[in-house]
């Protein structure tokens, strides 16, 4: 057995702890990236988008959850109602700034005209310092094409429940990265 001074033991122990923390963080980051399903590369050549905001009735947490969400979104009315109109306007303002600046997106008239759908599922409204903030999940759904036998699918989702403005900001940041816009 090798005898090490107390200071060397402490340094060696600190290095082992740091190495294990770094490995755990890298593994957590890999699972988080895999969970969010980033494949925005499919959106590079698609321009027409529609924004849909409503509270989903889907409570299934199994594999059928994505299919149920897609069915709800594709049957939904894209015009928001009630409190959701305010959430829609908050998100649309940020999307419109992106559209005006880069010109890589255009607003579709309805679901029939859109190539993909940006869907915000309102989970809750939080009241902080007498101000209401909408929180929810953001999804990007490609409508698919029956000619090529490609079903509608979720190609991107926020990795957690977020404030509406932050969620759309994350999507815009990822779109800029994928499309090479800066």
Question: At which residue positions do the language-model features occur?
Answer:
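Intrinsic disorder/low-complexity segments
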Residues: 21-22, 26, 160
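Bacterial N-terminal signal peptides that target proteins for export
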Residues: 2-12
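Bacterial N-terminal signal peptides
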Residues: 11-20
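Short, amphipathic alpha-helical "lid/cap" segments that border enzyme active or binding sites
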Residues: 164-176
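Surface-exposed short loop/turn segments
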Residues: 89, 93, 97-107, 111-166
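Short, flexible helical or helix-coil boundary motifs
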Residues: 19, 145-147, 179
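A structural "domain/chain start" motif
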Residues: 25-97, 179-182
């Amino acid at each position: 057995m090798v005898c090490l001074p107390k200071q060397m033991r402490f340094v060696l122990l600190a290095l082992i702890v740091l190495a294990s923390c770094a490995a755990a963080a890298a593994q957590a980051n890999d699972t988080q990236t895999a969970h969010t399903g980033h494949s925005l590369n499919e959106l590079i050549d698609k321009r027409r988008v529609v924004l849909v905001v409503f509270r989903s009735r889907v409570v299934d947490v199994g594999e059928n959850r994505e299919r149920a969400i897609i069915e709800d979104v594709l049957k939904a009315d894209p015009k928001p109602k009630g409190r959701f109109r305010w959430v829609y306007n908050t998100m649309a303002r940020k999307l419109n700034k992106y559209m005006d600046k880069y010109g890589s997106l255009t607003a579709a008239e309805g679901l029939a005209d859109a190539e993909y759908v940006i869907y915000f599922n309102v989970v809750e409204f939080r009241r902080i310092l007498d101000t209401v903030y909408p929180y929810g999940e953001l999804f990007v759904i490609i409508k698919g094409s029956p000619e090529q036998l490609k079903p509608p699918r979720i190609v991107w989702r926020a990795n957690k429940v977020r404030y509406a403005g932050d969620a759309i900001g994350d999507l815009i940041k990822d779109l800029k990265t994928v499309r090479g816009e800066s």
